[in-house]
Each structure stands twice: as structure tokens, then as C-alpha cells.
Amino acid sequence: MEAAREVLVEFGVPHEFTIVSAHRTPDRLYAYAQKAVQRGLQVIIAGAGGASHLPGMIASLTTIPVIGVPIRSSHSLAGLDSLLSIVQMPKGVPVATVAIDNAANAALLALRILALQDPTLHEKLRAFQKRLHEEALAPLQNPDYHFDQPLL
């Protein structure tokens, strides 16, 4: 989940980072989720391994978007059990889900949601996309990547 924090810091977005367990601290989970709106939270990124009930439980207790990050753990099936648990939510309890251990993409998705109401953040995301585009094309500056004949 540290990767999510790094992305949020890079974009200058205020955030909080805490630990809540659906199974070990259910009272804390309920209080956190039920007070999220009144505390001004706009998106919650919830990482969970194993049974991964945390993102779904949070989504069932609040109306703000929840992004689930399946986490590979020592007692999981390479994170696949976590992924399946998070994506198989019942109708009416939506949880957006990213790839296993991909907290960075969870943060980027959260930023896109926030950017709908924040033009400055929207422009930062556009600049980020442009940078990714340029980085992807950078190897083409190497003459070894140019071909005289079409590949097909």
C-alpha cells in the first residue's frame, strides 16, 4: 500500500493512511467507514489479503467510492483468493478493483475520480499521461529499433 501513498504524495493530494481489519477490528472498521463522509473523505483505497473482506465491508457502510487492492500474503493463494473476494461483490455494493499488489494504480484511479471536480489535478494527470507516453516512445530514439522493411 506504500505505492499508493507515494503516488498521492507525488500528486500533492492530501490523504490519510491507517490500519483497519475487517476481522480483527470490526468496531474500528464500522466507525471508520460510517464517519468517512462527515470527515470529508472522497475516495477510500482499501488493501486486503487472504479473505479480503475489508473493501466490501467499507463499501457496504459508506456511499463514497471504494477501491480494493488485493494483496499477496504469506497465507494467500498468490493473491488470487484476495482478488476473487474483492471482485465478487453483490449487486448494490460496488468495489472498484485493481490488479494484485497494484496499489499505485489504485491511487491513480482515486486521482481520476478526484480530478472530476479538480481542474488542477486533472492537468497534473494529463501531464503524467504525457510523460508515460514519452517514456514509452523513448527507445525509438535508438537506431536499432528502426526497420527498413515492415515487420509483416
Language model features with spans:
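Glycine-rich phosphate/diphosphate-binding loop of Rossmann-like nucleotide-binding domains
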Residues: 1-24
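Glycine/charged-rich beta-loop-alpha catalytic/anionic-binding loops adjacent to active sites
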Residues: 13-16, 40, 64, 87-95
